[in-house]
């Protein structure tokens, strides 16, 4: 069964009795599916099963093509309104030089201007694991350079061999 054919319509409805509602909101009550199909054909519309789990099943007399079009339109609108959060990651080490920090901060500011989130990751190697505070100090130093352009989403925290900090762009 294809994804589009999730609803039963017209002759596919096998229930003996159904609760029928018209396209204009008129309630036909509990009638046989043959009778409902006859009403739908007379009006030039389709009989569409709305709630198969109900006792008796609920069907609606409507234009199925128009209904499907409206459903697809709603899905497209919902998809447009979804905002994908893009997170850029900038990797650093504890022994990074100041000019390299400036270069990485410049890139981070470009990402923030584009509306992207930035995660700073300080990788701790070997003996640096004994003093992870050095990573926190480095991230605090970077934070002082970008605090006018960004909001700190997460304080510097430890995750395994990394010290992470997440920053987001300031709202205009």
Swiss-Prot record:
Monomer. It comes from the Bacteria. IF-3 binds to the 30S ribosomal subunit and shifts the equilibrium between 70S ribosomes and their 50S and 30S subunits in favor of the free subunits, thus enhancing the availability of 30S subunits on which protein synthesis initiation begins. Gene3D superfamilies: Translation initiation factor 3 (IF-3), C-terminal domain, Translation initiation factor 3 (IF-3), N-terminal domain. This is Translation initiation factor IF-3. One of its GO terms (molecular function) is ribosome binding. One of its GO terms (biological process) is ribosome disassembly. Pfam families: IF3_C (PF00707), IF3_N (PF05198). It is found in: Cytoplasm. Belongs to the IF-3 family. GO terms for cellular component: cytosol; membrane. Keywords: Cytoplasm, Initiation factor, Protein biosynthesis.
